[in-house]
Amino acid sequence: MDEIQDIEGLTRRALQAISRIDTLRDLTKLKNDNLGSTSWLAKYSASIKILSQEKKPIIGKAVSEARRKILEACQDRDLALRLNAQNEQFTRETLDITALPTRIFPGARHPIHVLQDKILDFFLMRGWSVVEGPELESEWLNFDALNIGPFHPAREESDTIFAEPRSASMLLRTHTSPVQLRALVSNPLPLYCVSSGKVFRSDPLDATHTPVFHQLEGLVCDRNITLGHLKGTVEDLARYLFGAEVNLRMRCNYFPFTEPSAEFDISRDGIDWTEWGGCGLVNSKVLSMAGVDTVHYTGFAFGFGLERTLQFIHSLSDMRDIVEGDIRFSQQFGLK
């Protein structure tokens, strides 16, 4: 029959075309051309109903056989193309362990962390210990135990970030001084320790303020501790950080947790002074809160901000440069 020959011829051409297909997109198009609703096979299928009773089973069988062969060929070719694509991908992604490495541009350590490590090394070399404490602190340790009364302005929500619920009396610490209390309670005397970490204030971010900054504090509790020990420690640290030519002065001030108290300023020329931090002999009330025998033991404490210290070292005018995290800022100091 002519119809059988036509179907077999079209089937052979379709199978030959399928074997030459190189892409899945072309295979999909060819499959639609031969098996789709407007394909030649669809037309032969539609014509079966008008054939004679003798031809219907013969043509129907030929159409079914052609559809089966073409469908199987399309499936086999689809699998082969996908395997080829996968193998090509594996070849592209193969790691040549003998190849020379490409240059990797390293990140840069933030200057604050480098400065922090430098200061901690200063104290570790002198036999001090490094202590740490939580950033989420109790209101009692942050204020009451440091002789900061219930009506002190620092306890207002405009200055301090309290955690919810407010009744829990928990807050983001406003200074690292609570760490000193924890150290006094958990360590035997004499105690020489330093702590550093993030503190939090309700301040806007501008050229001179940031709501999150780094603070470093030192604490000594021993027999016969005097202001002379405090002054000598701060002076040694200043020379270590800023050079032997730096000028340091102390001004009387008031802090609830030290008595007497002072602020210390630094200057390169002895004329323009920059406030650096605060210090004093630890208030006997604070020592008593920690269970220290104030008859036989005294102590001193000091603290300062690392951001302000970094500003003075590198003559930085805008604190926002320090906190924005731009790697180019760190790299300009040669820190990697």
Swiss-Prot record:
Intrachain disulfide bonds: none
Pfam families for the chain: Phe_tRNA-synt_N, tRNA-synt_2d
PROSITE patterns: AA_TRNA_LIGASE_II (PS50862)
Keyword Membrane in record: no
Subunit note: Tetramer of two alpha and two beta subunits.
Family: Belongs to the class-II aminoacyl-tRNA synthetase family. Phe-tRNA synthetase alpha subunit type 1 subfamily.
Protein's name in the database: Phenylalanine--tRNA ligase alpha subunit
Species in which this protein is naturally found: Tropheryma whipplei (strain TW08/27) (Whipple's bacillus)
